[in-house]
């Protein structure tokens, strides 16, 4: 005999528990409440979320969106430690931009990149992170030592380090929208504002640690932070900006780059993110050992190492001014509409909203890109009479329409709105991409090569001894500098230049005259290949 549905649902059933006590199961009438069936509990999402912060602070910053333009990646400089990510194609040095075929638009679809001291990361169109370079402290977010292939054979560590590969683990099913690198650590922001990091921090005594209980980690680990919208890194510290305008810092604080005092014997406390007494911040930046924050009224705050006045703060007491222990207003930047700030080891660059660039700090290797005849009288000389540092933020003459500026240890790159990239500073390892000349580049100079001739550069990164740029290949319109295009015959005049294991041949460089104030002269060079650019090259 079969019973109907209503009969079955109302029939009381009994079951025997483990202790032998009989108990009846609840039928539908037992769980009815106010004549209604219970509401099913919603499934709890397993995806990570930012930490909730008490209070109702208003959001003033947006979580970064994933860029959509797919870019080719070009590398130059020293590659002796796998920094260039060329895989099996080992290269000790590349003098001018060369295509990295592993990261081409049809294979990866890179939309953004980040460069650390000796490693790099690229962000793909689908929000995945690819890393390559030195992995001694797990900055790549994956294991490369003593690894075996599917046949059980050991895989060469250099090959694994030098081949751009995905970061898996906790990021496998997440969508990353921003990635950034320090010297020994990598950090990422997801599309819901979570912050993940991996690697470690170092200090003057060696490895400081990843956390107070862990020396280093190769596994992407979520930080206990509120909703994050921007990250900035120095050599071994991180600054995180929340969507509500708060600033958190952590890492090595020996030079007060964390903006808080710590006893030397308790420096592990610096490995835990802590907020600073700043509010309404809309942008953060960092040099190797100094830090910056910009608030919604355009005021700029700085802290950290200031020995060459890289914080932009002049202090009468020389010893007292060597470090700025807490966030301090940079009066010298009042009146400038600063968009972003970044720094190298001991120098700083600030990008203004109008596309110009300010520079200050150390200048012994032409890090500032300012011609001698345009330097203010406040420039400090060394005992030999050479430029040492400049404490006054000063406009770099002739460099305009800049959309991004990045600093390596002693060199810089600037990307302009017309898709070009300029470099200056130390060329000891050919990190400026100006050919096989290792003399310092005194002023911003156009970077040229056949590989990027028809590429509109969109983003750049500068490391310790190398650089990486990315752009749209086969751009429909050739980028124009100051409204003047290269003459067609320039394409036929190429200067053969040897590189280590590369056959790139650059377009002959143009070298326009420079006036006494550093601006380009209106007189054109005698060379037919010359193009009027915002600055000249250096000998």
Swiss-Prot record:
Keywords: Cell cycle, Cell division, Guanine-nucleotide releasing factor, Mitosis, Nucleus, Repeat
PROSITE patterns in alphabetical order: RCC1_1, RCC1_2, RCC1_3
This protein's GO CC annotations: chromatin; cytoplasm; mitotic spindle midzone; nucleus
Example of a GO biological process term: regulation of mitotic spindle assembly
Per-repeat ranges for RCC1: 70-125, 127-191, 192-243, 244-296, 298-353, 354-417, 419-472
Compartments in which it is found: Nucleus
Segments of this protein annotated with the region Disordered: 1-53, 478-539
Bias kind Basic and acidic residues: ranges: 11-33, 486-504
Amino acid composition bias (Basic residues), ranges on this chain: 34-43
Single GO MF annotation: guanyl-nucleotide exchange factor activity
Matches recorded under InterPro entries: Ran_GTPase-activating (IPR051553), RCC1/BLIP-II (IPR009091), Reg_chr_condens (IPR000408)
Compositional bias segments (type: Polar residues): 514-525
Superkingdom assignment: Eukaryota
Intrachain disulfide bonds: none
Subunit structure: Oligomer of dis3, pim1 and spi1. Interacts with ned1.
Function: Promotes the exchange of Ran(spi1)-bound GDP by GTP. Involved in the control of mitosis. Regulates a variety of nuclear events, including mitotic check-point, chromosome decondensation and mRNA processing/transport.
Name of the featured protein: Protein pim1
Species of provenance: Schizosaccharomyces pombe (strain 972 / ATCC 24843)
